[in-house]
Amino acid sequence: MASLIQVRDLLALRGRMKAAQISQTLNTPQPMINAMLQQLESMGKAVRIQEEPDGCLSGSCKSCPEGKACLREWWALR
């Protein structure tokens, strides 16, 4: 089980990462990593970066059958 400090240190070493990457690297369940990232965000230590859906060919992600799979969410230290 990873700690909040390990999540912070991993972000410091790698720059920015997806929550799934952090979960896999630290062998910690995704919901736990999501909670830790939200805690770091509320403490002002981490920031959520959402990419624009520029890869969407039709430009209509709301009606996309994959939902919002094209919207990537990254995390980085502030």
UniProtKB/Swiss-Prot annotation:
The keyword Transmembrane does not apply. May function as a transcriptional regulator that controls feoABC expression. One of its GO terms (molecular function) is iron-sulfur cluster binding. Belongs to the FeoC family. It comes from the Bacteria. This is Probable [Fe-S]-dependent transcriptional repressor. HAMAP family: FeoC (MF_01586). It holds the Pfam family FeoC. It comes from Escherichia coli O139:H28 (strain E24377A / ETEC). Iron-sulfur cluster binds at C56, C61, C64, C70. Keywords: DNA-binding, Iron, Iron-sulfur, Metal-binding, Repressor, Transcription, Transcription regulation.
